[in-house]
């Protein structure tokens, strides 16, 4: 990507975030084009893409035959096919898996590094963008296209926008917003996704979890009414037989070091500590607070106390902005 990522600053929680323009270099774009695009994706991901309109974006999972996620995808219609955004660390293996059956279909599946991914979040993000685009996405119309640019709208943890555009427009936006907006890198968007409860699947956790273990059903990412797709049997069994015992949790507190993706945490049991869970992502905020996204048993007590392994500091559960009640 010729567009240079912005230098890192410590991320800020959404409630205190000033207007910020963010380069999403840890995320990557991929596309599927061709006459069979919709049919092909319908047979590969958990969401019902046949029901998707031009105005929607969805979080969907791409699973293996056992229902474990290679990746999750932020999916939207693009040209005569679809585009999706996922963590850069999983894009190459995810595309390799997706292409396995493509020889039988009229589709072209490819990474897209020509376009640039930017985020706009923080104080009066909408007002800042209103001067630059003729229409902005909203709750009713979550995707807006203008020229070479696609804008995606997110409600949580506070209104924010993801911009998929060409290099020239990315440079124009940077020039226009540089004076009023702070600039930051992917860590800020990651912090917002953790706060929003959007599961982050990096390479360390690819092929490890069924979608429901990361709350995808609560985020509208799984259709239980659509036809066959890879891994469907296991995903359906987890719902209808209650086979899923895990959920995605948000923890905050302090830690002397950031836990890495794939690492476990420790849960306080009386005087002792017991290993539990798998970390998906963690970020340290500018106020020193640590936010951790972790998959654990879905019956954790809300007042449970956790820590990074052998650490002197503790973490506790924060509520997510959505419900897991079915």
Curated annotation (Swiss-Prot):
The keyword Cytoplasm applies. Gene3D superfamilies: 2.40.30.160, 3.30.70.1630, Aminomethyltransferase beta-barrel domains. Coiled coil: none annotated. GO terms for molecular function: folic acid binding. One of its GO terms (biological process) is iron-sulfur cluster assembly. SUPFAM superfamilies: Aminomethyltransferase beta-barrel domain, Folate-binding domain. One of its GO terms (cellular component) is cytoplasm. Pfam families: GCV_T, YgfZ_barrel. Folate binds at residues 27, 189. Keywords: Cytoplasm, Folate-binding, tRNA processing. It is found in: Cytoplasm. PANTHER family: TRANSFERASE CAF17, MITOCHONDRIAL-RELATED (PTHR22602:SF0). Belongs to the tRNA-modifying YgfZ family. HAMAP family: tRNA_modifying_YgfZ. Folate-binding protein involved in regulating the level of ATP-DnaA and in the modification of some tRNAs. It is probably a key factor in regulatory networks that act via tRNA modification, such as initiation of chromosomal replication. This is tRNA-modifying protein YgfZ. It comes from Escherichia coli O17:K52:H18 (strain UMN026 / ExPEC). The gene is ygfZ.
